[in-house]
Amino acid sequence: KSIFERDNRRDWLVIPDAVAAYVYETVNKMFPKVGQFLADAAQIPVIVGTRNFLIRETSKLSILAEQMMEKVKTLWNTKVLGYY
């Protein structure tokens, strides 16, 4: 499955999260202490807060984009193609 099908998330951080998970797994296998440092760094309140903010705001943008596309589709079908 692709990243988008597997996670089924609306936010735009799906790919960066997948890359970060891959990097963490690789580093953790080779250098467990560095892996632990990365895991600890990911839990710093500033990083967690920033990540949550980005997820929340990009989710809003995704919803707005979906709504806009639905309106454009409806407009196209009614005004251009003449469907009611």
Swiss-Prot record:
GO molecular-function terms, A-Z: enzyme inhibitor activity; nutrient reservoir activity
One GO BP annotation of this record: lipid metabolic process
Xref: InterPro entries: Apo-VLDL-II
Keyword Coiled coil attached: no
Similarity remark: Belongs to the apovitellenin family.
Job of this protein: Protein component of the very low density lipoprotein (VLDL) of egg-laying females. Potent lipoprotein lipase inhibitor, preventing the loss of triglycerides from VLDL on their way from the liver to the growing oocytes.
Name of the protein in its database record: Apovitellenin-1
Natural source organism: Dromaius novaehollandiae
High-level lineage: Eukaryota, Metazoa, Chordata, Craniata, Vertebrata
